[in-house]
């Protein structure tokens, strides 16, 4: 356990929610964004957890809606000179790591991730230095600097297989930053894992008793859970997986109702995949002042239409992701190591949050 970061005591600097736009304002910004994408030779990639309006716009303009790794891979394979990344900052960094020749813009560089914030590089480096006999495995939801300090980068879709592989080689593991996912992987593999103690603010808020009550109200519903959730929530699941895996589970499970324990932004693509199914939000700590996220990442909410238009129009230091070459090359090594491992096992690597 890390004694250097207490996720329960952390007070995150949440941003103000974007100002609600009128229908006319939305139409004007959508038109402007489409024009700016063409003028900049840009393509827009949006994460599953952004608002439905943003995901729809990405699809309409030839971009993609995906998990963090697939967003970066789509951008690296696209001919556009510029990527507009609607997500949080580590996603923009991952795109830059895979596409150093492209201009990577974001609606705002202030869109953070509690997992990233909860694993600052200086403290994490000291933690790793204190355990030099352990292989360092970090989740994709980390800064470029933390990735560069690691031996492996991993996504939730391949985490169990990778840790099983390392355990078979007799390696002991440092896992960072998500404590819940680390504990889930440890239970699945029985590997020797030392977990950094950070958590996703959205998944950390799902509540066991409230979910049990909801299951009583909807006894025929399947429960879909992201493994960043606490163990007690995972234990109630019919399916556990990454964002892409949960969408697939919603398609393949026979249930007509789905209680979904992840960010509600996923409902846009999940409903596309399962138009005949009813999707229900899993309960969090409450609404308003009684919960911190209320099942929606406050930083993802910063990716509004106005912010996207500003990012494309203004560019510059307030919107462009820049990573020095040495750091980028250092972060690329463990990322490529994971991709090679997955290719050798013929596994489909999907991202996380």
Curated annotation (Swiss-Prot):
Transmembrane segments: none annotated. It comes from the Bacteria. Pathway: Cofactor biosynthesis; NAD(+) biosynthesis; quinolinate from iminoaspartate: step 1/1. InterPro entries: NadA, NadA_sf, Quinolinate_synth_A_type1. Its main location: cytoplasm. Its cofactor is [4Fe-4S] cluster. GO terms for molecular function: 4 iron, 4 sulfur cluster binding; metal ion binding; quinolinate synthetase A activity. Belongs to the quinolinate synthase family. Type 1 subfamily. This is Quinolinate synthase. It comes from Erwinia tasmaniensis (strain DSM 17950 / CFBP 7177 / CIP 109463 / NCPPB 4357 / Et1/99). The gene is nadA.
